[in-house]
Amino acid sequence: MSFSVEVLAGIAIELQRGIGHQDRFQRLITTLRQVLACDASALLRYESGQFIPLAIDGLAQDVLGRRFTLEGHPRLEAIARAGDVVRFPADSDLPDPYDGLIPGQESLKVHACVGLPLFAGQNLIGALTFDAMTPAQFEVFSDEELRLIAALAAGALSNALLIEQLESQNMLPRSSAAFEPIKETHMIGLSPAMTQLKKEIEIVASSDLNVLIGGETGTGKELVAKAIHQGSPRAVNPLVYLNCAALPESVAESELFGHVKGAFTGAISNRSGKFEMADNGTLFLDEIGELSLALQAKLLRVLQYGDIQRVGDDRSLRVDVRVLAATNRDLREEVLAGRFRADLFHRLSVFPLFVPPLRERGNDVVLLAGYFCEQCRLRLGLSRVVLSPGARRHLLNYGWPGNVRELEHAIHRAVVLARATRAGDEVILEAQHFALSEDVLPAPPAESFLALPNCRNLRESTENFQRELIRQALAQNHHNWAASARALETDVANLHRLAKRLGLKD
């Protein structure tokens, strides 16, 4: 069999019809799957020793969230190193990365596979993979015909990468259709909400503006900060992280600005603070809403004038730091309540970003589940970890109050449970392995004071009552100490100290 001119022209026309990179890629692999009459096709981007799916047809949706490392997938490694068409026979000993990931064929293994490495000059930029359940499916196609397909795909991918590079250098205007970043940021998701967020990140990253990142706990605000830093001119310099919610008031100023020897008891030497460490780079202040008003005033001064003072030192030090701040609070309400400075809020929120909760991201749940399944597979040394159709439906129907972090933990727990009930190194996750309705239990009803155990004295009764209140607050807030402190209307540092005194934490 040979490709007719009409077939090749049809592939080229489909590429031209696409609106934006993603649409072109999808049209390409859908058309190629039809031409080769196979069960599945995929276009992969190569970056940093791994293949990243850009478009798929005939494969489970969670494949788009997986990241295929060369060391973890011998077939993909063979494709990357071959430099030409690679055909895997039906009896190949190398496991196929898509085993169990073709819908309706979860229990069967792929019988025929062809891989086409894609090059821009001498550089590997991606690959095309085609899979079939029929062993001899690809024998009718010559290597020369498959090379033609590879050339078309390589041209499309290379052009997309070039456009992205020129846009990032502000050498091309960013049209709404073409402006679809395809580089890897580990921010997995194709939902409208995530697509919009990625566009906003690309816009603000190249500037030097301070950014306020809002969103619920567990949505991935730190990943947003990393993406902004990586896309900025400061990427060659450090990104320094500080969790404001974990800062005891007594050391918070020293952590931010540093101290000199003898500034306070225990200051046995000079120490740089996070601002000095981030000089010429970026400082990410997580949970900034937990900072005291006194520290907010000192932070404001740094943003205004660009200088800091170490604790115990009269001298000022100049720093050049971009500040990215994150919070799960509504800082506008905090300003109205007098708990957050209005001038600091306006300094930070020049370009605010909001990370959507997982429940508003639709099918991104499945993509993220695929990513975490692949992580578990590598970590536990398994040959495959796949989601059954029932498990996918189960994940989509759940509300995810703990967002992406809860999904990650749920996948890890499900893999451990499934592995314990099935021999071998292959794991298929079923709905019953998640039991999500039990993962987030409502907090038990508060015991009345009279229902507490009899205690000898007032102090013991008070401590028991405090323990119960803290336990309930932690249960209701998914063991987030900052959120629990807000619910109890106390300072988070005081809550940590009280919990230690009551034996609730080490």
Curated annotation (Swiss-Prot):
Residues 187-416 form the Sigma-54 factor interaction domain. The modification 4-aspartylphosphate is found at residue 57. SUPFAM superfamilies: GAF domain-like, Homeodomain-like, P-loop containing nucleoside triphosphate hydrolases. GO terms for biological process: phosphorelay signal transduction system. Coiled coil: none annotated. GO terms for molecular function: ATP binding; ATP hydrolysis activity; DNA binding; DNA-binding transcription factor activity. Required for the expression of anaerobic nitric oxide (NO) reductase, acts as a transcriptional activator for at least the norVW operon. Activation also requires sigma-54. HAMAP family: NorR (MF_01314). This is Anaerobic nitric oxide reductase transcription regulator NorR. It comes from Salmonella arizonae (strain ATCC BAA-731 / CDC346-86 / RSK2980). The gene is norR.
